Amino acid sequence: MSHAKIFSWNVNGVRSALGKGLGDFIASADPDVLCLQETKCETAVASTLGLAFPHQFWHEAEKKGYSGTAVLSKTAPLSVATDFPGDHPPEGRVVTAEFNGLFVVSAYVPNSQRELERLDYRLQWDADFRKYLARLAKK
C-alpha cells in the first residue's frame, strides 16, 4: 500500500452506529481500511451487516455484547492476527492486519475502571502492547 486512507472509530456498538449514520460516513469518506473498536458484535452477525468491504476481520469478546475490534479493508492483507502475546482475557481487544510495508492495528485498550479496579491489569496490558508494537516495527 503506497497510499491509503485509514480511518479508526470507536463505534460503541457497530449495529447502533449503523443506525446513526456509520454506513453513510463510510460511503462518503470511502476509506481503504476501517478500524473499529468496541464493536460489541459477534463475528457471525458481523457478516450480515452489509458493510462494503471485501476483507473483514472481526475479533469478538468471549462475553456477548462486550468489547470487540475489527479491521475492514478493500485490499487483502498479507496476514491477520488477533490479540497479542501475554496473559490476557478473551476480550477481543486487538486485530492486526499486515499489508505490504505496513501493519494496521485496531486496538480497544482496557479501562482501569472506577476506583482503579483494573489498574494493575491495564499497566500490564500497556507494557505487553508496547512490546508487541516494537516487534511489529522491527519486521
Per-range role (PLM):
Residues 25, 83, 132:
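Residues that form generic nucleotide/phosphate-binding pockets
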Residues 9-16, 83-84, 121-123:
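Short, flexible loop segments at the rims of nucleotide/cofactor-binding pockets, characterized by
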Residues 18-19, 90, 129:
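Amphipathic coiled-coil/heptad-repeat helices and related helical stalk/stem segments
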Residues 1-51, 55, 61-67:
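N-terminal, active-site-proximal structural segment of metallo-dependent hydrolase catalytic domains
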